[in-house]
Structures are given as C-alpha cells and as structure tokens.
Amino acid sequence: MTLDNYNIFNDEYLFNMPLSPLPKVLGSFEAQSVLTLTTPTLTPTTTRNIEDTIGHLLSDTQADRGAGCAGFAVPKVLPNAMGAIEALGMGIPSGVTTIPIQTSYDMSLAQASESEDSNASYNDMQMNEEQDTTDTSSAHTDSTSYQTGHIMAGSVNGGGANNFTNVLAAVNSSRGVASAGSSNANTSNTPARRGGGRRPNRSTNMTPEEEQKRAVRRERNKQAAARCRKRRVDQTNELTEEVEQLEKRGDAMRKEIEALTNSKSELEYLLIAHRSTCQKIRSDMLSVNTCNGLIAPTGLLSAGSNGSGASSHHNHNSNDSSNGTITGMDATLNSTGRSNSPLDLKPSANIESLMLHIKDEPLDSTIDSGSSLDQNGPPPSKRVTLPPMSTMPHMSTLMTPTGASSGSLQTPITSTAPVAFGSAFPVTTNGSSINCITINSISNNNMNSPTLNALNKVPKERPNTLAFQRPMAQMHLTLPNNKAGGPTQIQGVPIQTPSTGTFNFDSLMDGGTGLTPVSGPLVPNSSSTNKHPLELPTPTAEPSKLVSL
C-alpha cells in the first residue's frame, strides 16, 4: 500500500500546491530539529535528524491499524478545499472516491505512535527556549519562530489558494495535541540529548563562579580569534605585496632579456658582414718584415740588405734572417725562431744611420786599479771596434828613462807587443820624458761590418803586457850632487815617503811583505841595477800609495 491510495498527491493537490521551499515542507513533519536560516546547507547532523524523523513516521506497519498502518496521519479535508477544487473546474477522477474522515483514528494513532518521543521533543523545545532568552542573535529568533509555527500563522485562513499548507497545518496541530497530552506524566525523566548542535548557553547546575570563569574564557577566546584573524590578514597582505614585487621583477627581467637578445642579433649580423674584410686585415697584420735580424718597415728592407754586403749571412736557425719575413704563431710567417716570443712590431732605423751616431771615445790613459791584470774579470762596458790591422804598426818600443850621471840605468828595455794589443796602443818613452798613450782614431769608413752582430763576432785576443804611464810625465827626477841613488827630490821638493826608493832583495826579505814601509830612502846597489820598479799610478795620482807588482 502506497501513499497514492489516499489521493494526497493527485492532480487536484499537485496543481493547487504552492511552490514552497523544501526546508519548510520538511520542517512541518518534525519537531526535534529543523534546518535553520543559519545552516542553509545539509550537514551530517541535520541529515541524520531528518532520517530519524521520517523513520519514526514510517516505522509502524502493524496490520491491526487498518487504513493508517503506514504511520501517516491522514489530514482532514476541509469543505472550503473541496469548494475551491470545484470552483477551479477540476473534476474528481472516476476511480477516486471521497476521502474518508477519520478523526477518531487520528487522535488514537497519534497518541499511540508518538508517546515514545514526547519527552525528547519537549526537552529540545525547552533548550531552544532557554537559548532564545539568553542569545540575541537573529538566527535563533528566526529558528524558534519557525519551529513554533509562527511562519505559517494566518495561512490557514487563506482559502483554497493554499490548500496543501492547510493540510500540513492540520497534521502539525494533531501532533502537537498528542505530544502535549502525553508528556505531562514524564517530565521528571530527562534523557540524554540526541544529535549534535551547540552546547546550551546556560546550565541549571552551574555555580556563579563557573559562569564567571566561562565568561572570562569566552572573552579570552574571542581576543585570540581576533588576533588570529588579524595575523592571517597581515600575512595575506604581505604575500600579496611580495607577489606584486616578484611580478614587477619578472617583467623587468623579461624586458632585459629581450634587449639582450636584440643586441646579440645585431652583433651576430655585424660579425657575419665583417668576416670577409677581417680575414684580409688579419693576414696583412701578421706579415712582419725584418732587416738583418731586426724588425724594420718594408721601405728599409732593400737598404739594409744592400748595406750589409757579404757580412750578412742567411741563417735558417737564428733570428738573423734577411729574407724579409719571420714566422711566428701564424702560418703567414716564414721562420720559427720567434715562435715562442711575442712579435715586436716597432719600426727600427737604418743600420747605416745607427753607425753614424756612435761616438769615438779614447781609451782611458790609466788602468783601473780594481781590475785584474790578466783580464779575468767581467768585460768592460765600453766596446770599441778595432781598426784594420794594415793601418797600425806592429812594434812598440818600451824604453826606460836614462840619465847622464847614472850609469846603472843605461840599459834599454825593448819589448815586442802582440799585434792586436801593441798596434792599437803604441807606448814610447825616451830619456826623462814619457809620452802619453795615443790611440788612433777610428774611422767609420774603415769598418768592414756595419751590423752590431758582426762586431760581436770579431775574435778577441788576450793581452800579455801592461800599458802604463808615469804619474809625473813632464818632471825630471834628479839626484842631489849627481850621486848614484834613487830620486829624493822633485823640482827641489824633498820626498818624505819611503815609496820613492826601490826595494832590494834584502829589504823585501827583512820587511816581510814588501808593503811595509822602511825608514829613509834606499839607495840602489849593484844587484838592483837592472831591477828598476815600474810604478803604477793610482786613481788619485798620489805617489805615497804603495802598489805591489
């Protein structure tokens, strides 16, 4: 047996039923929990309450209840509803009879089926009333007024325009009467609350101290919630500002990338267009001209090659290549001598013009006392080109001074100097006068090798004689009273140093080293006739200094 047998949802009711929202329709069938305006969506708690309500309405299926065995109380059909149906011109279908009015059954069925839920519904209504007395929120007010039936007030008298609403009001009134009649004896029993929901605002067994603590706790929770909301808002604002800054930075970087890409494209285009010209310039720059081992411009190549003559030799293993080019790191050069050194591209002057600027300096008339006699020390810093051998004499006569009164000094000393040394430095002494050392002037036209490399390749010979000069070249050394002995006066000035005398064998042995001065002038004897010492001048030309031969 279904609900259609009672003709509740037939055509006459469906067409006359107004378009009401679903929460209002469902809220008319239960009194325990309803959908309030504060919870417009279906939650698990409200869904369970709805299921419990529908389950209680449809749970009674006993056969002895007759027409009301489905648990649904048949509403009363009012006369004004039937009149409205006839006025609308909708006839009753042929298979549908008039709806029986079962007033006595409604009361008994409601009392028998709803007696078990009376206590729970009464307690829930009491708690809702307590919340309404303490809370001032509009949600509780709306839910309470909706639950007590204030919304549907006045809809019963609406005539035939709202017939289905009248039916629901009749059902609600019958349930309210049944619950009110059966709940007077069971008010002392307070069962546990069913379902979820908010905790009641006021408790009957709470002391004032506990109420004060609850108020303080609620105030503290409100402040904490406000701080949390403020912190969340601040964090959201900070994140929003950071996102905006990052977006601006990203836009700037994208613009910079576009600018760099454009610059790269332009540079690549310029390189491609310049590549053909760059190869020719590079080949011209890496070709270097040389003249006798020195890098020179192209115009001086022929002049340097002609001036060198036969002394310019082509050497494949040295840097003195005269073919005009050298080979470096690139294949355009022809020699490998400068491969590991950087190229010197400075232009150099002509070799002939360089030789004209060399100044002729005479050889020093005195020999440095710090230099060794056998020329074992470092070479001197000054280098003078030797003249040709044919223009210089091969002999130089070295004679000791002789006097008319000194017969022991009449033996001439003649020595032959080597060709390379004596021809370049002729030394001659006659009588008491000593000529200075002369040096022949060197002419640039007599040079066979105009290059510096050729000058360095001339072989050198070691000298085996010593060029010297008397410190007093124009002075006469005279003996007083024409007696035999060493000179003791120079132009009437007596000499007080012991270096004026000669050292004989006995004085050298007795003196120890020969450098020890002896008292008084020594007169040369017969054994020291041919052993006249050669005095060497010092840089200060002082005769008082002792020099050992």
Swiss-Prot record:
Gene: kay
Subunit comment: Homodimer. Heterodimer with Jra. The kay-Jra heterodimer binds more stably to the AP-1 site than either of the two proteins alone.
One Gene Ontology cellular component annotation held by this UniProt entry: nucleus
Function: Developmentally regulated transcription factor AP-1 binds and recognizes the enhancer DNA sequence: 5'-TGA[CG]TCA-3'. May play a role in the function or determination of a particular subset of cells in the developing embryo. It is able to carry out its function either independently of or in conjunction with Jra.
Keyword DNA-binding annotated: yes
Taxonomic lineage of the native organism: Eukaryota, Metazoa, Ecdysozoa, Arthropoda, Hexapoda
One term of GO molecular function: RNA polymerase II cis-regulatory region sequence-specific DNA binding
Matches recorded under PANTHER family: ACTIVATING TRANSCRIPTION FACTOR 3-RELATED, FOS TRANSCRIPTION FACTOR-RELATED
Entry's Gene Ontology BP terms: embryo development ending in birth or egg hatching
Modification type Phosphoserine: residues: S341
Name of the protein described by the UniProt record: Transcription factor kayak
Main location: nucleus
Domain of life: Eukaryota
Residue segments, region Leucine-zipper: 239-246
Ranges where the record places region Basic motif: 213-232
Location of the region described as Disordered in the Swiss-Prot/TrEMBL record: 177-233, 304-346, 363-390, 510-549
Domain bZIP: start-end pairs: 211-274
Gene3D superfamilies: 1.20.5.170
Subcellular location: Nucleus
Biased composition (Low complexity): 177-193, 304-324
